[in-house]
Amino acid sequence: MNATDAESRKPENKPSSESSSSGSTSGSSDGEVSSKTYFKNNKSKVLSGQREVVLEVVRDLSYTICKEAEEKLVERFPRKDGSNEMLPKEDSINTNHNYTTDSDEHPVELTTKTEECKNTEKTKKKSFVRALSKDKQLSAYRSRSRSTRLSYSGHISRTHSVEKSLSRYKKSVLRNRRTSFGHGRDSSTTKRSVSRDKDNRLRRRIGSSRSHTRSHSRFRRSEKKLPSRSPRRIRSQERRHERRRSMSSDYERIALRRSEPIKRRDKDEFFKNNKKVSGDIKKGKGNDNGTVAELEAKITERQRKSLDILTSRTGGACLTPDKLRMIQAEITDKSSAAYQSIAREALKKYIHGYINKVNVDSVAVITRKLLKDNIVRGRGVLCHSIIQAQATSPKFTHVYAAMVAIINSKFPNIGELLLKRLVIQFKRAFGCNDKTVCLTSSHFIAHLVNQRVAHEILALEILTLLIESPTDDNVEVAITFLKECGMKLTEVSSDRVGGIFELLKNILHQGKLDKRVQYMIKVLFQVRRDGFKDHQSIIESLELVEEYAQFTHLLLLEDVTYPKDILNEFKFDDQYETNEEKYKALSKNILGSHASDSDGSFGSGSNSETALSDCDKGKNEVNDKYTSGDIIDETKPNLIALRRTIYLTLNSCLDYEECAQKLMKMQLKTCQQNEFCQILLDCCAEQRTYEKFYGLLTHRICKMNKSFIEPFKEIFKDICQTTHCLDTNRLRNISKFFAHLLFTDAISWDVLDCIKLTEDEAITSRCIFIKSFFQELVEYMGLYHFNKKLKTEVLAGTLAGLFPKDNPRNIRFSINFFTSIGLGGITNELCQLLKIAPKSAPSSSSSSSLSSELSAPSDDDSSSDSENKKKHKGKNKKMTKKKNPSKKKEETKKIVGKNKIAAKNKTIKRRTDKDNSSSKDNFLKSESSSNESISLDSLSSELFAPSSYSSSESSNDSESKEKHKGKNKKMTKKKNPSNKREKTKKKLSKNKKAPNKNTKKRMTEKDISSSESSISESKSLNCSASNQNENEKRKKRVTSKSRTKRVKMFKQCQWVDADNQRDIKRKKRAEYRYEPLVYRKRNEEYLKKGGPNCRKDNYGNRQNHEISQRHDSEIKRRREERKKRHHEKNHSREYKRSKLGPCQREYFLYMCCQFYYPCTFQCLCQNCHFTFYS
């Protein structure tokens, strides 16, 4: 039909269309009920009429117009659900042409039918919109498209040729409709092809009113056979259809899985991301066997089949072992994808097998085996298998956490990946209200916090998230989480944990939760009161990583979003071999090059035998060079270069941890380790003062590689022998350096066996070294802990040189040395041993040597005292001669001159007898007193007495005191008149005392000898009586009222000869040592005799004067105050006289602190908490 005819018929059709549209609008507006009823009654008629019209249009269609329409552009026309579609221009032309032809034949029928179609469509739309919700529009649209597809397929069974061409076309249209939902072209782009003329608008209206008929007309074409299309065009169309089908399936999947669970969504995302890689490998399209050099190489069909068998779920388990080996032997190229996929499957099996074998005892061994395999490549599989194993067996969570802690210390990225996946798993389970997954994941996170893999902030965030919305499940999860990591959190941040417990208390008081959960909260508070003793943070057997070596990850709940599930799947590696070699070198550094599988320690290094063999190999190489005649450079350039690099790294690093990592990357040989340790020590010694940087650095290095411990031990032993070669500054720095190593247990304490502290081997440089060494240790540890460490049984044999017990001379030297440097508290055992040593049987060598040393100086003292007495006698005689007349002086000189030799012999014999008796008595007394307690006086006398004096000194001192008193009396007799003789006689008779030598002015030689013999006999028989006399004299001296007399007596004793002055000083020392015990005994005797109530008569004797007292509280109080005052006065007076040297004062203060006696001096030790008298 011509175009002119069509144009001439356009205005004729206009009123009909307008009328139809107006009629339809009026009908719909006036009454919708009538249209609905009309549609129900005439539904079958409308459908039959539409079919007839479409069949007539298709029959009249010519082949030429179809051919032209296929080549033209697409034209846009509206769809019945409102959205626009893109169809070929062929259909639009055909529809217009049919419309013009039909208008000639049946114009009225067409208008009525279009009106009916419009009404039916509107009613359908309104009912459809009311019935469906917004969420289900997509599914309704799909069901509609399926129904139309089925209705269309029923009309295509007439002609085969038309059916093929139109079915393809129909499928493309339907796919375009699907893609237009979320992926089609924008409306703004499609509007460009629409003409803005009135004719086009009119045509668009008519087309929209008859869209239903037009869609049916596509499928009912004439039965004439169309010519077949070219095969090239058909192939391109098929490819286009496949592409559209894949795209539509993807978008349908995305739309459908919005309501599906999270796991399936993750799998879909992963499939989309890795579709190309996995699809190419499975189909064999990709370059599976390709390397970097040969990209076009391909796997053979046989290799692909074997690869499918090996990478299947069974993993080749259905095959026999021989066949499996044959298949694996065929694939040998490591750079091929087939080999890499097989290796990955084997790695996955190893990882699963090792993780299933983990327990408390085998954690270290299994982690060591895991580190041998490339867990960096299989980190995704490792994390997945650990999480899966922990979920199936939560009782072993602490074991898995310990294994993760070891791996995290070596590879922190693996620990971070596992922690991220756990956090994401917890967040998803918390959002889905999955209680079991929340419990398992939170349990694992708690143990990772205990192992210092995760930071405590993550634990606090989880607790706050659970307690903010307090339901039964949330509170139960929070309680289990707090039980596991509560001890660690209280150590780190006790305030925040206290706030969480306060929130739990408020929740408990509200009473909204279940009774079971309330009981769980009460149990948690009881566990907190007990200090989490049943829920320890880390078991001792699982504390395998030290705090300094652990890497803690600070992750927040909001930051963690991506779990990196791609790492679970296979990925082709172009540089497979180089990466594997790198990991092997890394594992050797971690595990040691010659480490055995049974070893449980990490970074232990090579064995000593291998080190020796390496050194021997180096020596043999050097000898071979000498024999071969090569030139060898003895300047050692390699050693100089090593020193330079170490020195530069030490000075360039800011922190000791950074420096340790750099130094360990140098990969030193075993022969270079001694030089390395020596360089570190030299750098430390050259500093002006000691720097802790070097101590911390060596401690870190020794913990990272234990092969450095032995070189440091050898260096310490060498320095102890060569201290005389170093100056004081270097000695102090080195001593503090090794003190830090011993305190941190970087090297063992067995090194101290090389130190020997004796008088023969004592050198000033060695003493300085030991002094600074021990003082630094006491500063680090404290005196109490240091003393406790030295008393352990392990160090008993190593400290024999520092604290000798074989010889009393060495014992005294060690005691004096440590007391002089302010560490006298260490020598308590030696002091006790020195006191108890004489008790041992004479058969033992040590007791014999000790007793001989103690007895030898007693003879010397006795001889020296006898000589002193002779001198005193000579002086006394001179004093008496002054008072006598000149005649008697000559007579006495003659008598003394004749009998001088005889008198000397007698006195020597008596003195020796007396010394023997007194020494025996003292020995028996010491045995009786030592069974009860160690007395302070004997201990102090033995320690402070020099080696030339003995315990018999006390008896000699008592005699010398009496002599000094006799001298003082002679000095006073010069002033007194002759009538005082009678008074002295009366006093002697009343007091019943022994007769003095100097009572008479004129004494013959016989009287002097008789008085001396009587005194010596009485003293030898009754040694106890002499001690009582001494105590009575001291009491009288303290309790006497007149202090002036005592001062005069003391001054008179001072201007005696130098020999007498030495004896006086010795007496003062003895008195000072005995003072605490003497004062106690004196006060007890003073109170027994009546105390302040005791009065004296005219002759100076005490009398008990009883006073009638009232038993009132105030009288008692006054009496007690009086006693205190009296006691304080006596102590203050006596203590002010005593004067001691610095060493003796320090020791006396120490003994006072030990035995709880008050002293007048300010105490220097910081451990003393007693009050002292000033």
Swiss-Prot record:
Composition skew (Basic and acidic residues), residue ranges: 1-15, 79-92, 183-200, 235-259, 910-924, 1089-1118
Domain of life from the UniProt record: Eukaryota
SMART domains for this protein: MA3, MIF4G
GO molecular function terms listed in the Swiss-Prot or TrEMBL record: RNA binding
Species annotation: Musca domestica
Bias kind Low complexity: ranges: 16-35, 138-153, 597-608, 840-857, 926-957, 1010-1020
InterPro entries from the UniProt entry: ARM-type_fold (IPR016024), CWC22_splicing_factor (IPR050781), Initiation_fac_eIF4g_MI (IPR003891), MIF4G-like_typ-3 (IPR003890)
GO cellular component, one term: catalytic step 2 spliceosome
Note: The M.domestica genome only codes for one male determiner Mdmd protein, which is encoded in the M region, and can be located at different loci on the genome (chromosomes II, III, V or Y). The M region contains a cluster of tandemly repeated Mdmd copies with only one intact copy: other copies are degenerate with large truncations and frameshifts and are assumed to be non-functional. The presence of multiple copies in the M region may preserve its integrity in a hostile non-recombining environment. This protein is encoded on chromosome Y.
Domain MIF4G: 348-531
Signal peptide, first to last residue: none
Quaternary data: Component of the spliceosome C complex.
SUPFAM superfamilies: ARM repeat (SSF48371)
BP GO terms, sorted: cell differentiation; male sex determination; male sex differentiation; mRNA splicing, via spliceosome; regulation of mRNA splicing, via spliceosome
Chain intervals with Basic residues compositional bias: 167-180, 201-223, 869-886, 895-909, 963-1001, 1034-1045, 1119-1130
UniProt-recorded name of the protein: Male determiner protein Mdmd(Y)
